[in-house]
């Protein structure tokens, strides 16, 4: 059995295959997922697991160089937005690099998410709790 925090075999497989600039999406329970994109569905019930819990575990094994958010999260979900920014700041310190933040419209976010390696669906039931994580390199 793995000792690391990330135990989900599907997520672990996707993370291990990411190359520089490949992306992985962590979304709320309502984010549409195109049929052509790999879906990893973790949602058990409302808010289980939460968006922030999934971000925390995934980023424990993924090198992140950029994050893309829907600009609507700033006004429509400030608590999750602020908590996510705190997590990304802590991740910067742990990784020893800066993580670029980009904001796009929710419509553009949905378009870009369809180009990712996979979309992980959390049980989060709050608006715009979605992030596209862009892979960096560890060297």
UniProtKB/Swiss-Prot annotation:
GO terms for molecular function: D-ribose pyranase activity; intramolecular lyase activity; monosaccharide binding. GO terms for cellular component: cytosol. It catalyses: beta-D-ribopyranose = beta-D-ribofuranose. Keywords: Carbohydrate metabolism, Cytoplasm, Isomerase. Its main location: cytoplasm. It is found in: Cytoplasm. The keyword Cytoplasm applies. One of its GO terms (biological process) is D-ribose catabolic process. Gene3D superfamilies: RbsD-like domain. It is an enzyme of class 5 (isomerase). The active site is at residue 20. Pathway: Carbohydrate metabolism; D-ribose degradation; D-ribose 5-phosphate from beta-D-ribopyranose: step 1/2. The keyword Isomerase applies. Its EC number is 5.4.99.62. Substrate binds at residues 28, 106, 128-130. Homodecamer. Catalyzes the interconversion of beta-pyran and beta-furan forms of D-ribose. Belongs to the RbsD / FucU family. RbsD subfamily. This is D-ribose pyranase. It comes from Pectobacterium carotovorum subsp. carotovorum (strain PC1).
């Amino acid at each position: 059995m793995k000792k690391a925090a990330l135990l989900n075999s599907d997520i672990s497989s996707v993370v291990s295959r990411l190359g520089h600039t490949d992306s992985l999406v962590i979304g709320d329970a309502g984010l549409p997922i195109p049929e052509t994109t790999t879906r990893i569905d973790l949602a058990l019930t409302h808010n289980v697991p939460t968006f922030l819990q999934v971000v925390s575990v995934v980023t424990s094994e993924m090198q992140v160089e950029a994050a893309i958010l829907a600009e609507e999260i700033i006004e429509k979900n400030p608590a999750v937005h602020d908590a996510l920014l705190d997590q990304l700041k802590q991740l910067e310190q742990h990784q020893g690099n800066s993580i670029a933040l980009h904001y796009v419209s929710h419509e553009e976010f949905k378009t870009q998410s369809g180009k990712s390696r996979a979309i992980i669906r959390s049980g989060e039931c709050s608006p715009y709790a979605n992030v596209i994580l862009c892979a960096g390199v560890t060297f």
